[in-house]
Structures are given as C-alpha cells and as structure tokens.
C-alpha cells in the first residue's frame, strides 16, 4: 500500500489521452450526421422522382410534431418535478447516519448537478420523442377520422370511435402515465437525496413541500387511472374472455360494472390526495389507495371470475347466444363476407349421357397448364440468354386473342438475373445489365402434340398476341420483382437484347392440340401438328434445345460482350430514376450505398439517373405506407406497356366484436412455403380488411398509380384526407387495365380461413361447432404439409349461363377428409358481379371425396398405376399439377394434369403427358382431358366426339371375318406394346404416347371382334 505525500501534485492524464474520448465522440456524431443527411437527401429525391413528395413531407411533419410533443411532455414533467424538489429542499437536515451517508453523494453530485439535470431531462425527452414518432399513423387516423355509418352492438357508438379515436386515446393516456410515473420517481429520489424525504427520521419524515409535491403527482396519476378505467369499458368489445371475441356475458354483466365502480373509486382517491395538500395527513389518502388496489383485485378480477365460473359456464350456450351472434355479424361484416351466398348442393356422383353432353361446352375452358410447374419449361424455351429468368410460380391472367376469344393465360415477365458470371463486376451489374426484356405468355388450356405450352407471346424481339399494338409497345423491364439492386442509366451503353438469338422453336397456336376440344366435327378432323410430323420426338427436341439453351446459358465471352452473335444496346429515355445532377448528388448516393465507384466512374454524368426501389410491391409500400401490399405482384400488357399490378389492403385491428386473424398464418400455403415467388402477408393481427386500392407500377419508368378500388371504405377515406391527391379515382381506370384486374389472392385466403367457421350464421349452430370446416392440405406428393392454394380458373357455376373467371378453393369438415364445400369468387373485375362469393355446401353424408382422398385414389387406381408405373420405373420424373375442382353436371369434377420430365439432363423440362379426372368415386386417366373423361364415363364418347350414324353402326355389325379381325387386332396390340416399351427405354415420350394410342385402338378392335364372335356362336 502506498500513500501520497501531503502537497504532492496529483497525477494528470496526458493531454492527448484526455482529448481522445471527446474527439472520438465528435467523430462518431459527425459520421452519424453525414449518414443521416445522405439518407434524408436520397429519400427526398426519391419521393420527388415518383411524384409523391406529399407522402414524404406529411409523414415527416407528423413525426416531427409527435417527437416534439412527446419530448416536451417528458421534459416538462420530469424537469419541473426535479426542479421543484431541488428548490424546496430543506435548508437544515437533522443529523443522522442516513444523512451522513447521503452527504457523500450530495458532495459528488452538486458540482455537476446541471449536467446531471439536463442530461437526465434531455435523455428522457429524446427517448420519449423518438418513441412517440412510431404513433404517426395512429395520430393521422385520429385527426382525419371518417365515420363508418355503423354502430357497435354494445354501446351504440360509431365504429370509427373504436378504429380511429380509441387507439389514440390509449396512446395519450399511456404517455401521460409514463411521464407522471417517471416524474414521481425522479421527485422522490431528489427529495430523498436532499433530505425532503427521510426514511430513518424520528420525527417528521416528509417535509411539507415534499408532501405537497408528491401528493399532487399521485393525485394526477389517480386521475389518469380513473380516465383509463372509463376508457377500458369501451375496450370490452375487444375482450377474448368469452366463447367468441368481443364483450361476453361476463364482460357486460360483471366487468363493465366493475370498471364504472373503479372509475369512481379512483376519482375519490385522487380528490383525497389533492386534499392532502391542506389537511397534512397522508394516512387517509394512502389507506384509500390501498382500498382501491384491493377493490381492483376483488371487483375487477375475483367477481368476474366467480360470475364466469358459477353463472356462465353451466349455462354457456344460453347466456352467450346474443354475444356469439354479435361476433358472427361483426366478423362477417369486417372481412367482407357478409354477402357470401351459401347454396345447398347435393352433388351427384353418376352421370347420364345427356347430362354429360350438356356440360360439353365447358370442357375447352379447363385450365390444364399449371403455372407452378411450367416455369422450367418457360426457362428452357424462352430464357434466350442465361442472364434472364422467370419466377418459380407464373401467373394466370386473361387475354383476348386476335380471333376475339378470351382465354386463361399463363404469363411471366422475362426479368434480369444479373450479368453473366464471368462478367459480374460492379460496372456490368449496375450500369450495363440494367433491365429485362418482354413478356412471355401461353394459353392455359392448350398444349402442342408433345405436351409443351402453346405460346401466345414469345421470343426477343417480342412476337405474338400481346405485343401487337403497333409501334408503341415498350418491352423493357427496369422495374420488376427481381430488381433488388440499384442501376445507373444513361451512363454506359446498356445491354438491351441479343441480335438474332439462336432460340429454340416454340409451339404457337398453329401447333396447338387443345386437350379439351369442343364437340365439333371440324375439331375431330384437324390435321396433326407440323411439330409431330416433322421435328421428331419431344425428347430429341429437349436434347437439342438443351444444347442450345446450355450455350445460351453459359455463353462465350465473345457473345456476352456483344460481339459474335451481336447485341443491341439501349440508352434509357424514361423518368424512372433520380437524376444525378451534381457532384453532391453522387456523393450522397455513394454514401448511401457505400460505393466509391459512383463518384469515380467517368461515364456517370449529370444526365445519368440512378434507379432503385425497383420491386413493384416495395415501391407501392413506400409511396403508401398506410397500405398492406399483397404478396404477389403480377405483370400485364396494358395499352402497349408492361405494368405490374399490385393489390393493396387497408386493415385495422380495432373493429368491435370481429375475430382477429394472423395475416401471415392465413396467407401461408404451398407456394409461400416452397418458393420465393409468392410471399405471405406480414404477421400482423387484424380484424378488418378491404382491398381498397389497386396499384400499378410501370415496368419501364416506374410510375406508381394508386387507384381507389373500394372508395366507400372509411379507412381509405381517412387516409385520403391525410394524404390528399395520393389515391386516384376508380373512374380513371382504363378498360384495358380493368380487364386485367382480378380478385386478390391474399384477401381470398384470409376470407376463406374466416369462412371455415363463419359460414355459419346461427349462434346455436356456431356454438356446437359440428359444421366447422378447414382448408385441406395440398394433396400433391411434392407439396408438403401446407394448405392448398386457391386456383384461378374459368368455371360455369350451377345455374349460370356462361362460364366465369373465378378464384376457387375447397373445404373439408374439421377432422375429416371428405369434401364439405366448394367456394368460388367472381374474379373478373369488368363484371358487375365482381367479388360475388358463392359456396356450394355438400350434405354431411356426402360421398364426394375431398382433395386428399381423390389424390390417394388417383395414386392407388390400377388403371392409373398401369400408365404411371413404366414412367416411374424409368429415369423420368413424374410431377402432379394443380388439382382443380369445378362444378360439373350437377356434381364436382376433379382434374389434375400430369407432367413428365426426362431424367439425366439439365436441359429437360416438364411435358404435359396425362390428365387425371375424378367424379364421385370413379377416376380415370387419359392423354388429354377428352380421353380421360371418355374413360371415366365408360368410354361413352357421344357428347365429346362426332356421333356415329345408324347406317355406320349397321355397316360395322355386318363386317365379315370377325375371327381374322380379332387375330389382326391382337397382333397389332402386341406390336404397339413392344414399340411403346422400346420408346420408353429411349426416353422418347412422343413415340411412347403414340404407341399407347395404337395399343388402345387395337385392344378396342379386339374387344369388338370378340363380341362379334360371341354373337355368332349364340
């Protein structure tokens, strides 16, 4: 141990060391300030480039106002409390061990008390202000509230009070609570530190000034508690105590009265604390405070629990009936399903020839091409170069072809996947390879003779139906779902597209073999496609295309640099980016992206633009932060331009009596779990949702337009007041755009989950729960244990004269697998019946199989196994497509395409080879839908093919030499079987299919000849 000699100088820290901390802190602050400035400036420039500066400034002003309000509230509350406690400190403190110990702290704090004071007040103010800015949307909704025109069932208040006003009042009371509590704690600490409160004193323990100060703070706290009790009674409409969400019997008959009683008790306690300023006796208010706490436990907690246990539980159904009914009605209204029509549907399981003939006209519209399977086919046939890509799940839209027919269409945008790997560097990634090129579209109900999609729009430069709009068509895609990184345009020459690309020949409408032909003689007499006559087998084509595609995908350095095969370049002339007008702009973006090349690259001039926030959904979210955006934007050609269509929702979690739902859970299905192309909604709990906005994002210039779709929605009206001019009127939607708008997937998935229970509108039946449904798991073997996604298809609903473009789904009973119901919603936005939701409810005793059961029947059927077994034993990969369910001839028909992909080659892709169908308890398989249906209905082809005349029938009966015909037929069958097996071993699926057709035809002839022999013997 060492001692410092008296008078010896104190060791001092070197000057450099003493400056290190403040200099370091200053550097950190400066860097943070510069980064904040860069972010602020680039955000402002971006909003200016898209024309939504109103959103930027409104949000900024609101956040600044709330920051100032929250900071001022906390600063005043804590600052005044500390200041008053210090100024009223006693001049004389009685001597005690307690005060002796505190003297050391006082001597340390006093010289720096101003620093401590402003540090404490400033720090708390900053934290509170920053926290308050998060409530900017709550404040704007409160300030611009729009009435719903409907009242809650308990208090009779307009729904807007609960949706807009109630949440803001909760926020205000919460911040006042926090400020008073912290002010009280700070006051107690200062009073204790300076002797105003003495815990070990023999006489007076609290000085008069401290008593007044703390009594006022406790009185204010109790006034706030009283206000909170009063507000909590309205919050009972969000209670989850009862059988359903919302105020229950116990809430209305016990908790409500408890809140009112506690409100008055809190008021009395507050008055007693204020009176303590004059009466100078803290016992009475403190005792009253203890009694209030006890009352809150007994009246607010124990009493309702007794009522629930003793009164409600033994008589729950009778007592909860009116409250269950309130919940049913509110939930159906909040989710927009109150107009859903439930139709009793006793689905038949057998058909007559006449019934089948009546449905023949709907057969050609069945969408067999599965958008979740053919992505790889699009990739192989239409990728063109290896740096283009298609999403894993394509989209289903509708287009009117040049012959005037409107068809379900599988569409995808050919987006950029970054530069070739050997050229992947900063310049090529951000300045050269900047955009995708063109749309690709295929008919949803047609394939060619080998099972490939029939393309309506294809190739580079674009060819086909979608681009036939004259000179104005713009195929370039600068904004898309794969646009995660920024690009800088009008700098280097941009790669546009390959000149004279060596792309594989693709099937078009001239090559189509409709798998579901209409029952006309002309269709039966159609010649075989040129592909099948001239080009050889599908496998040979796949191998050749794979070689071409492999060369395209890998490419030579010469090709991908723009030499050799050549390339077209492009200079952007749109307004979709932020112009880099000055060195300052370049500096700000270099800081934002931490990329020095933005400053150093000489090609970047004052005319260059930086394009970022390129994902359509993200772009809409940014200009409309009050909206929840659907997980799947889809492309469409509208008036000669590719646009992305984005559905957006207004939501709330404050709709009285409506059951809340987790959006992420409700919108999760096979696609969201197995691919990155479809996203579930964010995991927010809401109990109100509307598809209030349809947004478009131009793929070339990034223009964002928000159309008010549900203009009667009070939530949208509220936001339109807060952000005037941001949402465009629905009347501005063009007819072309309207034809591509559709019922949104995520809204439908939310509604179908609610309808699992809320298709029941009677409280007693709802309480019983025997008729609850569930969405079945996707039955496909590759789907995993995920809910089946909804499917878009054109169907004819029972009782309708014409087919309707619909979004469909099925339900099974909870705990069972047979089919309970089929639901369809009109998805044609140009129709007056858009959004009409109809549900076919089957009897409990139905024999109709559910999706899981029919899939199991498909896979275990001897007829199906006979066809699939040779494929599965080979190297081929068999993929089950979307299992479609559709009303058909008084029953429900299941249709599932079957795809086959050759193994052993990266260049192979799925081909539609077979179609599975099921009706009632019968299943069948065929090379197309017509054949599958003929097999399903005992080979009765009369409704689907040209009928045979009576004369022809007599002629066939009179044909001689039945025995020789039988022998010849059997010989042909054996020959066809051998040829089919040989083709299968070689992987030639086209030849295999043809051999199977000859085998079937030979067996039919053999059966006919055998029947003729039997008649002769008789």
From Swiss-Prot:
The chain crosses the membrane at residues 20-40, 64-84, 115-135, 171-191, 212-232, 254-274, 287-307. Its main location: membrane. Residues 497-570, 939-965 are annotated as: Disordered. Pfam families: UPF0182. Residues 542-560, 939-959 have a biased composition (Acidic residues). It comes from the Bacteria. GO terms for cellular component: extracellular region; plasma membrane. Belongs to the UPF0182 family. HAMAP family: UPF0182 (MF_01600). This is UPF0182 protein Tfu_0541.
């Amino acid at each position: 141990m060492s001692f410092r000699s008296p008078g010896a100088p104190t060791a001092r820290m070197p000057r450099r060391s003493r400056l290190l901390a403040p200099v370091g802190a200053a550097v950190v602050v400066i860097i943070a300030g510069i980064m904040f400035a860069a972010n602020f400036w680039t955000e402002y420039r971006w909003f200016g480039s898209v024309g939504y500066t109103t959103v930027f400034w409104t949000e900024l002003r609101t956040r600044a106002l709330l920051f100032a309000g929250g900071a001022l509230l906390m600063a005043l509350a804590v600052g005044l409390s500390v200041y008053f406690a210090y100024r009223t400190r006693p001049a004389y403190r009685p001597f005690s061990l307690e005060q002796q110990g505190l003297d050391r702290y006082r001597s340390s704090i006093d010289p720096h008390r101003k620093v401590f004071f402003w540090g404490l007040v400033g720090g708390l103010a900053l934290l509170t202000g920053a926290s308050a800015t998060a409530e900017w949307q709550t404040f704007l909704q409160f300030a611009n509230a729009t009435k719903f025109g409907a009242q809650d069932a308990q208090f009779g208040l307009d729904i807007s009070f609960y949706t807009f006003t109630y949440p803001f009042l909760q926020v205000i009371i919460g911040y006042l609570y926090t400020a008073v509590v912290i002010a009280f704690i700070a006051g107690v600490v200062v009073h204790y530190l300076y002797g105003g409160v003495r815990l070990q004193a023999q006489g007076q323990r609290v000085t008069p000034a401290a008593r007044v100060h703390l009594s006022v703070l406790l009185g204010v706290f109790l006034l706030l508690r009283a206000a909170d009790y009063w507000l909590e009674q309205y919050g009972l409409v969000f209670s989850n105590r009862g059988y359903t969400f919302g105020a229950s019997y116990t809430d209305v008959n016990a908790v409500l009265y408890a809140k009112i009683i506690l409100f008055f008790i809190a008021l009395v306690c507050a008055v007693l604390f204020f009176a303590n300023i004059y009466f100078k006796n803290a016992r009475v208010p403190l005792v009253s405070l203890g009694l209030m706490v006890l009352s809150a436990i007994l009246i607010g907690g124990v009493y309702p629990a007794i009522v629930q246990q003793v009164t409600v539980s033994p008589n729950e159904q009778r007592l909860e009936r009116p409250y269950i009914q309130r919940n049913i009605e509110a939930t159906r209204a909040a989710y927009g399903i109150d107009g859903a029509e439930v139709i009793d549907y006793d689905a038949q399981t057998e058909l007559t020839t006449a019934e089948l003939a009546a449905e023949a006209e709907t057969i050609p519209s069945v969408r067999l091409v599965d958008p979740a399977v053919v992505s790889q086919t699009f990739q192989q046939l239409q990728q063109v170069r290896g740096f283009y890509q298609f999403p894993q799940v394509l989209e289903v839209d509708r287009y009117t072809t040049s012959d005037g027919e409107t068809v379900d269409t599988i569409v995808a945008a050919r987006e950029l996947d970054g530069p070739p790997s050997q050229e992947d560097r900063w310049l090529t990634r951000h300045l050269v390879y900047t955009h995708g090129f063109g749309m690709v579209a295929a008919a949803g109900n047609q394939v060619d003779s080998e099972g490939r999609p029939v393309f309506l729009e294809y190739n580079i430069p674009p060819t086909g139906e979608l681009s036939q709009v004259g000179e104005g068509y713009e195929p370039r895609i600068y904004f898309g779902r794969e646009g995660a990184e920024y690009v800088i345009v009008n700098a280097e020459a941009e790669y546009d597209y390959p000149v004279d690309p060596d792309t594989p020949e693709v099937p078009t409408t001239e090559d189509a073999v409709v798998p579901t032909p209409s029952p006309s003689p002309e269709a039966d007499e159609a010649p075989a496609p040129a592909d099948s006559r001239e080009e050889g087998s599908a496998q040979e084509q796949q191998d050749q295309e794979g070689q071409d595609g492999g060369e395209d995908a890998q490419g030579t350095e010469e090709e991908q640099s723009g030499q050799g095969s050549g390339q077209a370049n492009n200079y952007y002339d749109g307004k979709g980016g932020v112009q880099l007008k000055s060195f300052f702009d370049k500096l700000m973006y270099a800081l934002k992206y931490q990329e020095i090349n933005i400053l150093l690259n000489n090609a970047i001039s004052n005319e260059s633009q930086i394009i970022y926030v390129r994902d359509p959904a993200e772009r809409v979210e940014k200009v409309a932060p009050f909206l929840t955006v659907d997980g799947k934007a889809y492309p469409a050609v509208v008036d000669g331009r590719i646009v992305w269509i984005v559905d957006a929702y207004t939501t709330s979690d404050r709709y009285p009596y409506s059951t809340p739902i987790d959006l992420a859970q409700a919108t999760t299905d096979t696609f969201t779990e197995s691919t990155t192309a479809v996203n579930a909604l964010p995991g927010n709990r809401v109990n109100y949702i509307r598809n209030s906005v349809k947004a478009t994002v131009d793929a070339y210039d990034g223009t964002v337009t928000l159309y008010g779709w549900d203009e009667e929605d009070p939530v949208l009206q509220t936001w339109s007041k807060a952000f005037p001019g941001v949402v465009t009127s629905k009347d501005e939607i063009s007819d072309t755009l309207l034809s591509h708008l559709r019922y949104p997937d995520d809204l439908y998935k939310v509604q179908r989950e609610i309808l699992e229970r809320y298709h029941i509108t009677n409280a007693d039946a709802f309480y019983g729960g025997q008729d609850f449904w569930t969405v079945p798991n996707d039955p496909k073997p590759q789907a995993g244990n995920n809910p089946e996604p909804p499917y878009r298809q054109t169907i004819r609903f029972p009782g309708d004269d014409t087919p309707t473009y619909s979004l469909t789904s099925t339900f099974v009973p909870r705990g069972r697998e047979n089919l309970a119901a089929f639901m369809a919603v009109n998805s044609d936005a140009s129709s007056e019946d858009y959004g009409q939701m109809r549900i076919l409810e089957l009897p409990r005793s139905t024999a109709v199989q559910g999706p899981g059961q029919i899939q199991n029947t498909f896979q275990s059927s001897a007829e199906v196994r006979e066809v699939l077994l040779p494929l599965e034993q080979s190297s081929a990969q068999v993929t089950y497509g979307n299992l479609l369910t559709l009303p058909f001839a008084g029953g429900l028909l299941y249709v599932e395409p079957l795809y086959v992909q050759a193994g052993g080659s990266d260049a192979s892709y799925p081909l539609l080879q077979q179609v599975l169908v099921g009706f009632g308890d019968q299943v069948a398989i065929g090379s197309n839908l017509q054949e599958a249906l003929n097999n399903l209905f005992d080979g009765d082809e009369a409704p689907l093919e040209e009928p045979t005349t009576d004369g022809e029938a007599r002629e066939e009966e009179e044909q001689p030499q039945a025995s020789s015909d039988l022998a010849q037929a059997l010989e042909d069958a054996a020959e066809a079987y051998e040829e089919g097996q040989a083709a299968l071993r070689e992987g030639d699926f086209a030849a295999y299919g043809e051999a199977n057709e000859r085998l079937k035809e030979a067996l039919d002839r053999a059966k006919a000849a055998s029947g003729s022999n039997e008649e002769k013997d008789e």
